[in-house]
Every structure is written in structure tokens, then in C-alpha cells.
Amino acid sequence: MMEPSEYHEYQARGKEMVDYICQYLSTVRERQVTPNVKPGYLRAQIPSSAPEEPDSWDSIFGDIEQIIMPGVVHWQSPHMHAYYPALTSWPSLLGDMLADAINCLGFTWASSPACTELEMNIMDWLAKMLGLPDFFLHHHPSSQGGGVLQRTVSESTLIALLAARKNKILEMKAHEPNADESSLNARLVAYASDQAHSSVEKAGLISLVKIKFLPVDDNFSLRGEALQKAIEEDKQQGLVPVFVCATLGTTGVCAFDKLSELGPICAREGLWLHVDAAYAGTAFLRPELRGFLKGIEYADSFTFNPSKWMMVHFDCTGFWVKDKYKLQQTFSVNPIYLRHANSGVATDFMHWQIPLSRRFRSIKLWFVIRSFGVKNLQAHVRHGTDMAKYFESLVRSDPVFEIPAERHLGLVVFRLKGPNCLTESVLKEIAKTGQVFLIPATIQDKLIIRFTVTSQFTTKDDILRDWNLIREAANLVLSQHCTSQPSPRAKNLIPPPVTRDSKDLTNGLSLESVNEGGDDPVQVRKIFRLPGDSLETTMDPFDDCFSEEASDTTKHKLSSFLFSYLSVQNKKKTMRSLSCNSMPMSAQKSPPPDASVKHGGFFRARIFSGFPEEMMMMKKGGFKKLIKFYSVPSFPECSSQCGTLQLPCCPLQAMV
């Protein structure tokens, strides 16, 4: 309890902190998003032991900028695009200020009636705002379900799986009364898509329930056919299907599982259907986006994070169940010191969660909904999706980038055309600046960049500024890779970035035959020219591949052979490595290893027996470089994108 004099101190310092927070949030876009610190950076700035005597508040307050802020990733910045949003707002901050002052532990109704009852009513508000079924409401005549605020969606998924497990084991014991619960548990199996969040796997580890991650369709969506097939296979193996986690808005590409197909299967097979809409749940404030909810009437539980996109700061997760009694039978413990006069009549949320104690989370949610109203919250969602559409249009206008998955809501995934190493290098260049925060993901073996519109204050100018930084990084990477160790003839190969349409870019490079040996066809060499370039600026793949003693005739003979040989071989290939550091993979069976491998010269001669003798005059590594140069599938008809040019080569190592 504070002394009267301390209230005045708190009042003054509180105003000072509010002023600091306002200044921080209003200027956060001007700060570098990611810090320039290394692990352990704070150790040297903080004493090894706590102070024996109190520090002054002025000293503590000064250390915020000196010690804390240099190591902060600024999640509220409009230039923070790495993860799904983690937004806040002034009503949310004020709500937690009050909740922290009250500091009640609402484990039972009796421990804080307002904490329990406000939460019940606000969860009903929220369910109606999202268009959820009536059976998720606390206050509805036909409902035996309701909603509760949990800490995270990860915890909600675990709670749902534990409830499903308990309910299924009780069903199994009715038919096998003598069976041990652990042996019954060992037969259980649950399902999710291979795009599901990592928390699903963790829930399986904790509950000791096997989780099978099922393949998705071309839109990264889990379909009913895949689920039904897995269920039938597992039942034949003696397993008992128990649980399905359907994701609405996956982490990687914001894909949506097909509830309308999964739901009927779960109902027919007796599986608990849990819906994870951690990010996308806020979008359902807009009725026109609720098409993804088709099939929600089959759900046994539903969860989403207001703490992501709804401007309610962490932690705040909504979790609804169709049947609260299945939840309570899983988590109910009832020691005498937790009983009260209204036990059994009032709702005690300690039976709806894993911990006993719980915070007064509903105040900040109540403040936010009342302060903004449904219409302004809907407008907030619309703004985020509009900004994502704008970024998508910028990416699509640049032919060196591609968007490998459909944009949904505020997430755009994109990549640099070509091998994964190009996209990885772009990310590294962007990370060096600290001005934009982006992270990678993978889909179908392609490395992608996730760009999420997060801040409610993001403008088109912010998006354009970040896009220009991305393009600058891409241009730098492409120029470095395409002119790595250039020969004098290649010094002008990559021009400064210019604005040209895709047709110009595609047709900007021509394949020509240059005869330097009179009428001898073997001395015709293939080179690549940009319009307006002289022969001195063209790229020759044979630089540095041969020793200095090799004649031009030798080089030209091998050039002609490789061109004709590999053009045919590439048409036979069924698989090709995407790595820039490995040889193309041939569909032809490799010769079995034998003792000749130990004798490099003999083995090399045997491998090259069908090649011209000039092959033996190449430098070490020269053959590999030339093979890569000519190994783009169906050369020369196909080409790999390299910067603002179309080069029929591997952009990282084909040029020497």
C-alpha cells in the first residue's frame, strides 16, 4: 500500500511516463526498426548485483533511452513487417493501467465478480461482432458454451486438445472399462495441415497425442479429401482419431483451410474440430470477409488474438467452446479453499484454463471496443488490407519479383525470381540497414519474403519508402551476383536500373553467332549481347575456364560441342537442382562407383570418354562452370531471370 506522499509521486511520474509513451509512439516511424546489438549486449550496462539503496527515479527514467531502447525491436513502427501485427492503442493502455492498479486474481467468481462477469459479457459481444454461432455465447437460451480470455492462441490450442483427449478417453473407457488411460491415450491421433502453426506440434508433445500434418492443395488449404484419407488409414492401423486443428490464416501465407469440407467429416467421425484464426479472426469484423467462416457451425472451439490486429495489446486471446462442460471436466479441481457460496451456480474461470490465477484482461478489451466502436474497427481492418493491396501492386509492377501465393488480408509474400539464394541475399541486405524488418518463409521449396502491414498508422508513403528500400537491396544483389569477378568484356553487362516494361526486359538480350574462324563452323562462338553493346562489352563463358596455353580453336570446338550436347540432354531431364552451388541433376542413372574413383585421372578420362579431347585442357572447376552456363532447362529456349536481364545461365556462377 502506498503512503499518501507516494500518490503524489506516482501522479507526477505517471504523467511523465504518459508523455514519454506519447512521444515514443508518435515518432516511432523515425526510429530504426531493428537494433544494432549482439547477444549479451546488456550485461556490461547493468551492475552484476541489485542496488542496496534505492536509485532515484530520474536515474531509472534516464536508463530507458540509454539501456532499453537501443535493444528494442519497434513492433509499433509502420516499417515493421516481419510478423503478424502486435498492436496497441491508448484505450488498451489505459485499460491495463487500471487493471494493474486493481490487480485482482479472478480465478473464481467470488475472488472478483466484476472480473468474471465483464469477461463473460465482452466475450459475447466479441462473438457477435465476428459472426460466430450462438452456441458460443454465455447468454443464450440454447447455448451450453461460452468464451474466455486466455493468454495465447498456443495455450488455447493445447486446452482444446486436452479437452478433446479427455472426452475421447471417457468414450473409450465406456467400451473398455478395464483399459488403462495411458494405453488409450497412446492410440489417439490428431490432425492439422502441414501449414499449421508450430504450437499445434507443441500441444501434441505436451498431451502425448500423435499429430499428423496433412498435405494441402495448391492454395495451401487443407481439404476434406486429405483428412478423410488419413482418418481411414489410421483407423485401419488401430488408431483413434480425436482432434482436427483447422487454420484460418496460416502463418506462412495466410491460407485458409476448408471448414465446409472438414466440418462434416469431423461431425461424422466424432472428432473435435478446433479453429485457429489467430491473425485472421479480426478480419471477420467485416461481414464481406466471413466467407472463410463457412462451416464454422461444425466447430467445437474457436480462438483468435485481439492482441494481433484489433489494437488490444498482448496478452489477450479469445477462446470459445461449444460445450463448456467438456472443458470443465478436463481442468476441474476443487479444493475447499477455492469453494464459495455460489460454487456450481456462478462461472469459475479457473476450470476453463491451465493456470489457477488470471488477470483482469477484459477491461482493456472493453475500453477498446467502446472507444472505437464496431464501425471504426471495421475501417481499421479495411485500411490494413488496402495497404497490402497497394504493396502487392508495386511488387507485381516489377518484373524481377514474383508473388508465389495469393494475397490474403494484410499479408503479401514475394520473392526475387530465380534461385533461393537471391532472395536470401536480398533479405540479408535489407537486414543490414535496420530500416525495415522482414522475415523469410518457405513454400514448395521456394524461399519467400513475408510482408505484413501491421501499424494502424501505415500510409502509402510508408509502403512506398519500404518498397524502394527492397528494390535497392534487390538491385544491389543482382548487380553483385551478375558481375561477380567480371571479365573486362562483362564490365558493362548490368546497366543502372531503368524503367522499362516487361516486354523490353524480356527481349533486352540477344543470342548471336560470332564467327572468328572464317568458314569453320566449330569456330562459331555463342555470346550474349545487350542492344547497343559492342563486342568488348559482351559476356564470354569461357573466360578463366582454360589454361593460357589453350588456343581459341580449342575453346570454340568445346563451345560448339557443349551447345549441341546439352541442348539435347536438357530436354531429357525430369529434375534439376535449384541450388546455385550444385551440379544440375540428371534423370539418367549415375554409373556405379568403383575402384577407379580412387584414381582421379583414370576416372576423369572414363567420364570424359565421350567428350572432345579438348576437355582435358580445362582448369579445375572450368567444366563445372561451363556445364552450369549451358544447363538451364531446354537451353536456349528457356532462361533464368537475372536482374533486369534475361540470361540463359545460373546468375551466381555462370559468369566468370
Swiss-Prot record:
The modification N6-(pyridoxal phosphate)lysine is found at residue 308. Gene3D superfamilies: Aspartate Aminotransferase, domain 1, dopa decarboxylase, N-terminal domain, Type I PLP-dependent aspartate aminotransferase-like (Major domain). The keyword Transit peptide does not apply. One of its GO terms (cellular component) is cytoplasm. InterPro entries: Aromatic_deC, PyrdxlP-dep_de-COase, PyrdxlP-dep_Trfase, PyrdxlP-dep_Trfase_major, PyrdxlP-dep_Trfase_small, Pyridoxal-P_BS. May be post-translationally processed. Its EC number is 4.1.1.22. Keywords: Catecholamine biosynthesis, Decarboxylase, Lyase, Phosphoprotein, Pyridoxal phosphate. The modification Phosphoserine is found at residues 343, 362. Phosphorylation of brain HDC by cAMP-dependent protein kinase leads to enzyme inactivation. Pathway: Amine and polyamine biosynthesis; histamine biosynthesis; histamine from L-histidine: step 1/1. One of its GO terms (biological process) is histamine biosynthetic process. Substrate binds at residues 84, 197. It holds the Pfam family Pyridoxal_deC. GO terms for molecular function: amino acid binding; histidine decarboxylase activity; identical protein binding; pyridoxal phosphate binding. Residues 481-502 are annotated as: Disordered. It catalyses: L-histidine + H(+) = histamine + CO2. Its cofactor is pyridoxal 5'-phosphate. Brain, glandular regions of the stomach, mast cells and fetal liver. Belongs to the group II decarboxylase family. A putative trans-splicing which involves HDC and SHBG gene regions produces a fusion protein expressed in fetal liver. Homodimer. Catalyzes the biosynthesis of histamine from histidine. This is Histidine decarboxylase. The lineage of its organism: Eukaryota, Metazoa, Chordata, Craniata, Vertebrata. The gene is Hdc.
